[in-house]
Amino acid sequence: MAELNVEIVAVDRKIWSGAGTFLFTRTTVGEIGILPNHIPLVAQLVDDAMVRVERDGDKDLRIAVDGGFMSVTDAGVSILAESAEFESEIDEAVARQDSESDDPRTAARGRARLRAVGAID
């Protein structure tokens, strides 16, 4: 099966780099799925985005992303985020509490984290 190179980087660290067969996320213009050989594009991610990377023969990666941009080129997909967390790094109870915050940024971050752990769509 064809693969695409994916690199996810946050301001403070490189999150993940590897091969995937499909990438799904939410942008400011809607949900988008990226397959190998996708046309080039640049998109702004929503503040409560979750990135899912499907991998051939491996478990899907689910990463909560706080804002940022996605670039798709012939070389693959690059996501540059303000912050990002793997599903395994997220405390669901804390994420749920954050999602109910009066602060819009904190609430968005909480929703992204809940999406990453599969608690909400």
Curated annotation (Swiss-Prot):
Membrane topology, record value: Peripheral membrane protein
Location(s), subcellular: Cell membrane
GO molecular function terms listed in the Swiss-Prot or TrEMBL record: ATP binding; proton-transporting ATP synthase activity, rotational mechanism
Pfam families to which the protein is assigned, alphabetical: ATP-synt_DE_N
InterPro entries assigned: ATP_synth_F1_dsu/esu, ATP_synth_F1_dsu/esu_N, ATPsynth_dsu/esu_N
Keyword annotations of the record: ATP synthesis, Cell membrane, CF(1), Hydrogen ion transport, Ion transport, Membrane, Transport
Coarse class of the protein's main subcellular location: membrane
CDD domains: F1-ATPase_delta
Highest taxon above the source species: Bacteria
GO cellular component terms listed in the entry, alphabetical order: plasma membrane; proton-transporting ATP synthase complex
HAMAP family: ATP_synth_epsil_bac (MF_00530)
Family in the record: Belongs to the ATPase epsilon chain family.
NCBIfam families hit by this protein: ATP_synt_epsi, PRK13442.1
Assembly: F-type ATPases have 2 components, CF(1) - the catalytic core - and CF(0) - the membrane proton channel. CF(1) has five subunits: alpha(3), beta(3), gamma(1), delta(1), epsilon(1). CF(0) has three main subunits: a, b and c.
Function statement: Produces ATP from ADP in the presence of a proton gradient across the membrane.
Name this protein carries in UniProt: ATP synthase epsilon chain
Species, as recorded: Mycobacterium marinum (strain ATCC BAA-535 / M)
Protein's gene: atpC
